[in-house]
Amino acid sequence: MRKWYFILLAGVLTSVILAFVYDKTKANEEGSGDYLYVSPNGSDQNEGTKEKPFRTLAHASEKAAAGTTVMIREGTYHETLDVKHSGTDGKPITFRNYENENVVISGESVANAEYETPLIRIHDKHDIAISGLTIQDLSVSSEEATAIGIYVSGSSSHIAIKDNHIRGIKTTADEGNAHGIAVYGTGSMKDIRIEDNTVEKLTLGASEAVVLNGNIDGFTVAGNVVRNNNNIGIDLIGYEGTADKNDYVRNGVVENNTVYQNSTYGNPAYGDEYSAGGIYVDGGHDIEIKNNTVYDNDIGIEATSEHKGKYANAIQITDNKVYNNAYTGISIGGYDKKRGGTSNSLIARNIMYRNDTKGLYGGQLLLQYDTKNNTIEKNILTAGDSRLFIGNDFTENEGNTVNHNVYHKEADQDGIWMWKKKEYDSFSSYRKATKNDQQSIYADPMFRDEASYDFSLDPDSPARPVIE
């Protein structure tokens, strides 16, 4: 009798355990605990489960605690998302699309505002992730207002913005402002990650598609596509008065991005100027810009400071492909004597190919006002129609090292080099007068297929011993 009793008891316990495991698994899948669900067909009176989802992003944001993933079901949400709570270390709060469903946050119904108007706002929060969303169609008409797709501000940290598509954010004011992704370190920020997003077709006025500004220490901008915008693609800014202290972006990496067709030409804030950088460091420090593909912008990559007496310092611009940009390929130094400059930076192993497409005499490499103690080496430069390899129309140029570069020699084409306002129409006269490029060569680098922008070198390329 006792034997059968224990067998029966064991069976009951097993059933209870299995039921508990099933219920726990079902709860995790459906929203009780780690997951909340939102759907256009839901109700904020629901429980937030998969079967009974919430209706609004706002309600989900109020309910989401550390470790919660808010699964957003397919549809268009005509509302803004204000992230209300922080996650914790190892337990972020995540807002993302469910599986591969198409989730759109639309600004079409957002009232025209007078100040910052973001579709997603993260202020003074930490351990937050935004992923897999399309953020679009927000417009402002006032010069005092700024339309923003995703806006991070205050002392936020450990923020991940990944796999989103941002488009159609715009200002219609001639001197207005708009951003796709804007991170403003008004307080102390760290660990900001912007990865694998597409940011396109923005009307930006005087602002930038993707910007980090102020007191930000530690960031990654990687794998993004930034294209077809009417101002700067990616901007890293300091010294604008955004933060009370440490007012400059620093200690970050910008890598593996594809940035193209960003131009201010025709933008009412600039008129007929070609002044939009694909990637721009304006007063940042200790930043790596590497392995990016940057083409068909006004300026490929630029590093300087727009503020007198300030510098873009310790910037490493390496292993980038920079081609067919309107004004110049890579630029350092301020655009006039009222600006700051570039110091202690490295430009190495880049391809600068047929930039200066508008004949603006920016060449492939441009040194402007106040450049000092920079190293320019192991690059391959192919001139455009202007035939200018290096432009340097300022004498404020000291301690810069230029050597071990390859200048592409082409049949029946001469090159031009400029240094401290003096122009040289032969490689030998340029080297003799400036003492630059003593171990550099003027030769055909033998690209594998330059017509297809494949700049890998043939095995017998004379460039190999110089740059490798």
Curated annotation (Swiss-Prot):
Q: Which InterPro entries does its entry note?
A: Carb-bd_sugar_hydrolysis-dom, PbH1, Pectin_lyas_fold, Pectin_lyase_fold/virulence, Pel9A-like_beta_helix, Polysaccharide_Lyase_9
Q: Write one Gene Ontology MF term.
A: carbon-oxygen lyase activity, acting on polysaccharides
| Pfam families given in the database record | Pel9A-like_beta_helix
Q: Which GO terms describe its cellular component?
A: extracellular region
Residue ranges of the PbH1 repeats are 125-154, 156-185, 189-214, 216-238, 249-283, 284-305, 312-334, 397-420
Signal peptide boundaries = 1-27
Spell out the protein name for this chain. Answer: Uncharacterized protein YwoF
Originating species = Bacillus subtilis (strain 168)
Q: What is the lineage of its organism?
A: Bacteria, Bacillati, Bacillota, Bacilli, Bacillales
